[in-house]
Amino acid sequence: LGDRVAVNTVLICGTCFWCMRGQQSVCPNMAVAGFMADGGLAEFMVWPADHMVLLPDNISDVEAPLIEPATVAVHGVRRSGVRAGDNVAVIGCGTVGLLTLQAFKAAGARVIAVDVRDQSLMLARELGADETVNCKDENTAAAQIRELTGNIGPDITAETAGAKETPRMAIEWTRR
């Protein structure tokens, strides 16, 4: 009690067909902190000790909350197969999107940040985006993406916004 910890926010059963096959992301018994159980913004949170990691003193209270979203971003970038020089669009410049942008930059990609908020796009530029596109007008945004990629489209598009229309945009914009 009182220790500073990072939390693995997903609980799985470990015994169902999917868990036994290594496909824990589709476990029907899954609980996710903040959705199916109390999350980190609750005054108190009960969570299994084996899903927590003690934070060392050299990780500040400001940095600690970025551990979980950073793992999401880095995992996605690793799975993407990105290569140095690839054109990458990151749709959504919230916490996960900005961390994803930085991970793609670290991998040597040219990154186009896409969002509906100009303030978020300014922050994306400060954090390393090579180009920014406001997608309030989807047709204009699609044309800008094509222009920025030589009429081919991004090699990879990461959808981090979670909006209804953004998965379709990601599929349509990405090169064939």
What are these regions (language model features)?
Residues 97-98:
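N-terminal Rossmann-fold NAD(P) dinucleotide-binding loop
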Residues 174-176:
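Helix-to-beta-strand junctions that scaffold the AdoMet/dcAdoMet cofactor pocket
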Residues 2-4, 85:
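Loop/turn positions that initiate beta-strands
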